Amino acid sequence: RAGGGDGIIDENMHDVAYLRGRVGPEVVAAMAVIGREVKRESGLVVGVQILAGANVEAVAVAHAAGLDFARAEGYAFAHIADEGWIESSAAELLRYRRQIGAGRVQVWADVKKKHSSHAVTTDISLGETAEAVEFMRGDAVVVTGSVTGRPPRVEDVREVKAHCRLTVALGSGIDADNLADFYPDADAFIIGSHLKKDGH
């Protein structure tokens, strides 16, 4: 807060090797406790992502801890990640969110996410993927570079912004030197690597 940030996202970044799609109750419990304390201490907008692709669990954590959004990978269209095949989760996720009464928890969906192969969807553009997130009732799209710490291409951000009316957040590689390059196309910046030392 003192540094001028508007929000925080909690993520089990170093819980490697990541499980695919589902995590154990100990991860859910830990993320809920951490998230609740971060929200209480900061008073900021707080989101959560549970790797890898544990989107249902992330929504449950956000709901239980009073957080504002869950970041979801594999929301629209499938892809191959480090962990294997990641299916689209939008249908299950939105129904689960409604079932537990968590409608106030926003879903921020990665499009053509980092650390993944998108060969199976090469005929679908980044803009079309963003359109699909909007069609599937996502609340925001997250655009990244190809890996953690690498920024997205400016033209990719512009394409996404031109194809949907959702909040466009940038999810990797943003720092003090390149942040201005992405105005006015980006609405939010998730800054992690730039603030860390040796990855922590």
What positions do the PLM features span?
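Active-site mouth loops of central-metabolism enzymes
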Residues: 1, 45-54, 109-127, 170, ...
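Glycine-rich, proline-tolerant flexible connector loops at the mouths of alpha/beta enzymes
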Residues: 7-30, 76-82, 138-152, 196-200
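Hydrophobic faces of well-ordered beta-strands that scaffold small-molecule active sites
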Residues: 8-10, 46-50, 70-72, 105-111, ...
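Alpha-helix-loop-beta-strand connector modules within alpha/beta enzyme cores
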Residues: 19-48, 88-109, 152-175
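Glycine/small-residue-rich loop that forms an oxyanion/phosphate-binding "nest" at active or ligand-binding sites
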Residues: 31-79, 85
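Catalytic cores of alpha/beta
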Residues: 53-66, 129, 160-166, 170-191
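Conserved anion-binding
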Residues: 63-140
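C-terminal helical cap(s) of enzyme catalytic domains, especially alpha/beta-barrels
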Residues: 84-92, 157, 161, 188-200
